[in-house]
Curated annotation (Swiss-Prot):
Entry GO MF terms: FMN binding; pyridoxamine phosphate oxidase activity
Function as written in the Swiss-Prot or TrEMBL entry: Catalyzes the oxidation of either pyridoxine 5'-phosphate (PNP) or pyridoxamine 5'-phosphate (PMP) into pyridoxal 5'-phosphate (PLP).
Gene Ontology BP annotations: pyridoxine biosynthetic process
InterPro entries assigned to the protein according to its UniProt record, in alphabetical order: Pyridox_Oxase, Pyridox_Oxase_CS, Pyridox_Oxase_N, Pyridoxamine_oxidase_dimer_C, Split_barrel_FMN-bd
Pathway info: Cofactor metabolism; pyridoxal 5'-phosphate salvage; pyridoxal 5'-phosphate from pyridoxamine 5'-phosphate: step 1/1; Cofactor metabolism; pyridoxal 5'-phosphate salvage; pyridoxal 5'-phosphate from pyridoxine 5'-phosphate: step 1/1
Organism: Bordetella pertussis (strain Tohama I / ATCC BAA-589 / NCTC 13251)
Comment on bound cofactor: Binds 1 FMN per subunit.
Chain positions recorded as substrate binding sites: 7-10, 65, 122, 126, 130, 188-190
Quaternary structure (record): Homodimer.
Residues that coordinate or bind FMN: 60-65, 75-76, 81-82, 104, 139-140, 182, 192
This protein's name: Pyridoxine/pyridoxamine 5'-phosphate oxidase
Stated family: Belongs to the pyridoxamine 5'-phosphate oxidase family.
SUPFAM superfamilies with a match to the protein in the record: FMN-binding split barrel
Pfam families: PNP_phzG_C, PNPOx_N
Length: 210
Protein backbone atom coordinates (compact mmCIF):
# COMPACT_ATOMS: atom_id res chain seq x y z
CA UNK A 1 0.00 0.00 0.00
CA UNK A 2 1.25 3.46 -0.88
CA UNK A 3 1.49 6.16 1.76
CA UNK A 4 -0.89 8.22 -0.37
CA UNK A 5 -3.51 5.47 -0.02
CA UNK A 6 -3.62 5.73 3.78
CA UNK A 7 -6.73 7.59 4.88
CA UNK A 8 -9.36 7.45 7.60
CA UNK A 9 -12.89 8.76 7.89
CA UNK A 10 -13.54 10.87 10.98
CA UNK A 11 -16.97 10.21 12.47
CA UNK A 12 -16.68 10.31 16.27
CA UNK A 13 -17.95 13.75 17.17
CA UNK A 14 -18.99 17.27 16.31
CA UNK A 15 -17.94 20.71 17.54
CA UNK A 16 -20.52 23.46 17.17
CA UNK A 17 -20.53 26.98 18.52
CA UNK A 18 -23.71 26.48 20.53
CA UNK A 19 -22.09 23.73 22.60
CA UNK A 20 -18.61 25.26 22.94
CA UNK A 21 -17.63 26.84 26.25
CA UNK A 22 -17.35 30.63 26.33
CA UNK A 23 -13.81 30.31 27.69
CA UNK A 24 -11.14 28.32 25.83
CA UNK A 25 -9.72 27.23 29.18
CA UNK A 26 -13.09 25.69 30.06
CA UNK A 27 -13.31 24.07 26.62
CA UNK A 28 -9.81 22.64 27.03
CA UNK A 29 -10.62 21.28 30.49
CA UNK A 30 -13.76 19.63 29.11
CA UNK A 31 -11.89 17.93 26.29
CA UNK A 32 -8.93 17.00 28.49
CA UNK A 33 -11.25 15.33 31.00
CA UNK A 34 -12.95 13.44 28.18
CA UNK A 35 -9.55 12.28 26.88
CA UNK A 36 -8.66 11.00 30.35
CA UNK A 37 -12.05 9.26 30.68
CA UNK A 38 -11.57 7.66 27.25
CA UNK A 39 -8.19 6.31 28.40
CA UNK A 40 -6.31 8.08 25.63
CA UNK A 41 -2.63 7.11 26.13
CA UNK A 42 -0.75 9.95 27.82
CA UNK A 43 -3.43 12.60 27.28
CA UNK A 44 -1.04 15.14 28.83
CA UNK A 45 1.50 14.66 26.02
CA UNK A 46 1.80 17.66 23.73
CA UNK A 47 4.00 18.87 20.91
CA UNK A 48 5.94 22.00 21.86
CA UNK A 49 7.12 24.05 18.88
CA UNK A 50 9.78 26.73 19.32
CA UNK A 51 11.87 28.95 17.03
CA UNK A 52 15.45 30.06 17.60
CA UNK A 53 17.03 33.45 16.93
CA UNK A 54 17.76 32.48 13.30
CA UNK A 55 14.14 31.50 12.65
CA UNK A 56 14.84 27.75 12.67
CA UNK A 57 11.82 25.89 14.09
CA UNK A 58 11.99 22.72 16.16
CA UNK A 59 9.36 20.57 17.84
CA UNK A 60 9.28 17.81 20.43
CA UNK A 61 6.84 15.97 22.68
CA UNK A 62 6.72 17.15 26.30
CA UNK A 63 4.27 16.51 29.13
CA UNK A 64 2.01 19.19 30.53
CA UNK A 65 2.16 19.25 34.32
CA UNK A 66 -0.52 21.80 35.10
CA UNK A 67 -2.97 24.21 33.53
CA UNK A 68 -5.40 26.90 34.63
CA UNK A 69 -6.52 30.30 33.41
CA UNK A 70 -2.95 31.58 33.87
CA UNK A 71 -1.57 29.15 31.30
CA UNK A 72 -0.02 25.76 30.61
CA UNK A 73 2.99 24.55 32.62
CA UNK A 74 5.77 22.14 31.71
CA UNK A 75 9.25 21.48 33.11
CA UNK A 76 12.58 20.95 31.39
CA UNK A 77 16.29 21.72 31.29
CA UNK A 78 16.76 25.46 30.75
CA UNK A 79 19.98 24.75 28.80
CA UNK A 80 18.30 22.36 26.34
CA UNK A 81 17.60 23.33 22.75
CA UNK A 82 14.06 24.36 23.61
CA UNK A 83 15.33 26.38 26.57
CA UNK A 84 17.82 28.24 24.38
CA UNK A 85 15.11 28.78 21.76
CA UNK A 86 12.81 30.28 24.38
CA UNK A 87 15.58 32.55 25.67
CA UNK A 88 15.89 33.96 22.15
CA UNK A 89 12.19 33.94 21.24
CA UNK A 90 9.52 33.36 23.91
CA UNK A 91 6.73 32.80 21.38
CA UNK A 92 5.72 29.16 21.11
CA UNK A 93 2.90 26.79 20.18
CA UNK A 94 1.46 23.69 21.85
CA UNK A 95 -0.43 20.91 20.10
CA UNK A 96 -2.48 18.19 21.79
CA UNK A 97 -3.60 15.31 19.54
CA UNK A 98 -6.11 12.86 20.99
CA UNK A 99 -6.40 10.44 18.08
CA UNK A 100 -8.96 8.04 19.62
CA UNK A 101 -11.36 11.00 19.92
CA UNK A 102 -10.32 12.49 16.55
CA UNK A 103 -9.50 15.79 18.25
CA UNK A 104 -6.63 18.21 18.44
CA UNK A 105 -6.07 21.49 20.25
CA UNK A 106 -3.54 24.08 19.12
CA UNK A 107 -2.50 26.80 21.57
CA UNK A 108 -0.27 29.78 20.77
CA UNK A 109 1.22 32.24 23.20
CA UNK A 110 4.21 33.66 25.02
CA UNK A 111 6.27 31.61 27.46
CA UNK A 112 7.80 32.71 30.75
CA UNK A 113 9.60 30.84 33.51
CA UNK A 114 7.57 29.85 36.57
CA UNK A 115 8.76 30.87 40.04
CA UNK A 116 11.63 29.06 41.73
CA UNK A 117 9.19 27.94 44.43
CA UNK A 118 6.89 26.34 41.84
CA UNK A 119 9.84 24.59 40.19
CA UNK A 120 11.11 23.37 43.57
CA UNK A 121 7.71 21.98 44.54
CA UNK A 122 7.35 19.97 41.35
CA UNK A 123 10.98 18.82 41.30
CA UNK A 124 10.73 17.33 44.78
CA UNK A 125 7.54 15.45 43.81
CA UNK A 126 9.40 13.50 41.09
CA UNK A 127 10.80 9.98 41.49
CA UNK A 128 14.40 9.86 42.70
CA UNK A 129 15.67 8.56 39.37
CA UNK A 130 14.13 11.51 37.54
CA UNK A 131 15.64 13.99 39.99
CA UNK A 132 19.10 12.46 39.58
CA UNK A 133 18.60 12.37 35.82
CA UNK A 134 18.07 16.12 35.81
CA UNK A 135 21.60 16.47 37.18
CA UNK A 136 23.16 13.78 34.99
CA UNK A 137 21.81 15.00 31.67
CA UNK A 138 23.40 17.88 29.80
CA UNK A 139 20.29 17.88 27.67
CA UNK A 140 20.78 18.11 23.89
CA UNK A 141 24.59 17.80 24.18
CA UNK A 142 26.45 14.81 22.65
CA UNK A 143 27.30 12.07 25.17
CA UNK A 144 27.93 8.32 25.24
CA UNK A 145 25.71 5.97 27.22
CA UNK A 146 28.64 5.05 29.47
CA UNK A 147 29.31 8.71 30.24
CA UNK A 148 25.64 9.36 31.00
CA UNK A 149 25.42 6.43 33.41
CA UNK A 150 28.69 7.45 35.06
CA UNK A 151 27.30 10.94 35.66
CA UNK A 152 24.14 9.47 37.17
CA UNK A 153 26.26 7.40 39.59
CA UNK A 154 28.34 10.47 40.41
CA UNK A 155 25.31 12.50 41.45
CA UNK A 156 23.70 9.57 43.25
CA UNK A 157 26.88 9.25 45.34
CA UNK A 158 26.95 13.00 45.91
CA UNK A 159 23.31 13.61 46.86
CA UNK A 160 21.95 10.21 47.90
CA UNK A 161 18.17 10.30 48.10
CA UNK A 162 17.88 14.08 48.49
CA UNK A 163 19.20 15.84 45.39
CA UNK A 164 18.36 19.56 45.25
CA UNK A 165 16.83 21.07 42.14
CA UNK A 166 19.56 21.90 39.62
CA UNK A 167 19.77 25.62 38.82
CA UNK A 168 19.48 24.75 35.11
CA UNK A 169 16.16 22.89 35.52
CA UNK A 170 12.68 24.28 36.08
CA UNK A 171 9.30 25.19 34.70
CA UNK A 172 7.80 27.31 31.98
CA UNK A 173 4.28 28.65 31.59
CA UNK A 174 2.76 29.36 28.19
CA UNK A 175 0.30 32.26 28.45
CA UNK A 176 -2.13 31.73 25.56
CA UNK A 177 -3.32 34.37 23.13
CA UNK A 178 -4.95 31.99 20.65
CA UNK A 179 -6.63 28.58 20.80
CA UNK A 180 -7.92 26.35 18.03
CA UNK A 181 -10.09 23.30 18.70
CA UNK A 182 -10.34 20.74 15.89
CA UNK A 183 -12.82 17.89 15.63
CA UNK A 184 -12.53 15.45 12.74
CA UNK A 185 -15.66 15.16 10.55
CA UNK A 186 -16.64 13.08 7.49
CA UNK A 187 -15.54 14.15 3.99
CA UNK A 188 -12.72 16.20 5.53
CA UNK A 189 -15.28 18.89 6.47
CA UNK A 190 -13.75 19.16 9.92
CA UNK A 191 -14.95 21.47 12.69
CA UNK A 192 -12.44 24.18 13.66
CA UNK A 193 -13.20 26.79 16.31
CA UNK A 194 -10.71 29.57 17.02
CA UNK A 195 -10.67 31.57 20.25
CA UNK A 196 -8.95 34.97 20.40
CA UNK A 197 -9.06 37.74 23.04
CA UNK A 198 -11.88 40.23 22.45
CA UNK A 199 -10.13 43.09 24.26
CA UNK A 200 -12.78 43.07 27.01
CA UNK A 201 -11.51 40.26 29.26
CA UNK A 202 -13.39 37.74 27.13
CA UNK A 203 -12.90 35.71 23.97
CA UNK A 204 -14.28 35.77 20.44
CA UNK A 205 -15.10 32.43 18.78
CA UNK A 206 -14.79 32.03 15.01
CA UNK A 207 -15.40 29.00 12.83
CA UNK A 208 -12.55 28.38 10.38
CA UNK A 209 -12.73 26.62 7.05
CA UNK A 210 -11.37 23.07 7.27
Amino acid sequence: MSVSDLRQSYEKGVLVEEQAAASPFQQFARWFDEAVAARVPEPNAMTLATVNAEGQPSARIVLIKGYDDAGFVFFTNYESRKGLDLDANPRASLLFFWQPLERQVRIEGVIEKVSAAESDEYFHSRPLGSRLGAWASRQSQPITRDELEAREREFRDRYGEHPPRPPHWGGYRLKPNRFEFWQGRPSRLHDRLRYEPDGKQGWTIDRLSP
